[in-house]
């Protein structure tokens, strides 16, 4: 069994994308492969079939490997709930919340979970394709590292180092990162990959020759900048949009400090009839057809932030003029009358007034609800699938007019009597073409084009595998993967 690890010189260097590409490339070679990320810090997460929580990037990588997502693919997930602390999720389950200093001491325990998951995957698959986190050259984080070289040393695996040339300084990034590694760690780096290159490769070649001579390590390949590649972002919000049709629906999403699962909006960003705008701090909410209140890892503090930016008033004005409002998960909770956090799960214990737009209240409880679901969106009786990730238990008369009827017999969410407001706990509801079309019609778009988001993602995964085949040294990759 072989393990190959991809590490990056910086965050967003292309690690997630490269692991996705390599997984599909190996599948094309007839080799079963499992993706793996020892430790992930992200507010975008997915739910596995067994009801665990992992990073969404690993769920996409699982799709590339033709596998169902599993908690062993991301044994440690950190979900920030403040500027200095995170909820710690081990093997898909939240075990505690702690600040960065406490977590540094906790890493020895987390490493046990990491190695156990890797061992299980190694027994089940010929190749385990590993994604590092951030950069291996973060000197302050070297002690007790479980995400990069600490893991590579523990399992004795080779490493490829990827850097983003589009940011500039690619040779400094690669050489500097290598110089900051220990001799044994340097020996693990078997080659470099340069990502997002634009222009004539002949102009880059002298630099590649210098890099190989300077380090004694090969350049495995240069990946081109791909303009219209749209895979789910792991961290930052992807604001790119495709060209839009003449008739568009204007959708606005206020960006909250603890926004979670903003990948919910990727299908809208890619829809030819939707003009999706993210509104940041200090910006007014512009005229729109639909305002969506997103998920949040800290609902009460994000409610306070929403009010401080004047967005509560903007939502009320939007409704007076006939606009539609949709709340997803934490956004659903904000639509109600009260949000109670008696245990201090998302910050200081206490209660906050909601927006008071729907007649229910929410209490945060220790046991998190994690499940993949299917059902019918009661708008047009449209089929919908999605996933629940929430600690809130919502009760009240407003739930009698549900938004979704689930196949397991439960109802979900609520609608206002006048039909202007809808809330649901379901993440990913726009990924189902029928539900997306129904929601866009509800928001005011008359002639809706159906878009198959899953087919778009599959197309992009195939394109990534083409890039591996056409731009990387596949013989060296075969050698490193032991195939």
From Swiss-Prot:
Keywords: Cobalamin biosynthesis, Glutamine amidotransferase. Residues 248-435 form the GATase cobBQ-type domain. PROSITE patterns: GATASE_COBBQ. GO terms for molecular function: ABC-type vitamin B12 transporter activity; catalytic activity. It comes from the Bacteria. InterPro entries: Class_I_gatase-like (IPR029062), CobQ/CobB/MinD/ParA_Nub-bd_dom (IPR002586), CobQ_GATase1 (IPR033949), CobQ_N (IPR047045), CobQ_synth (IPR004459), GATase_3 (IPR011698), P-loop_NTPase (IPR027417). One of its GO terms (biological process) is cobalamin biosynthetic process. The active site is at 329 (nucleophile), 427. Pathway: Cofactor biosynthesis; adenosylcobalamin biosynthesis. Belongs to the CobB/CobQ family. CobQ subfamily. PANTHER family: COBYRIC ACID SYNTHASE, DETHIOBIOTIN SYNTHETASE. HAMAP family: CobQ (MF_00028). Catalyzes amidations at positions B, D, E, and G on adenosylcobyrinic A,C-diamide. NH(2) groups are provided by glutamine, and one molecule of ATP is hydrogenolyzed for each amidation. This is Cobyric acid synthase. It comes from Pseudomonas fluorescens (strain SBW25).
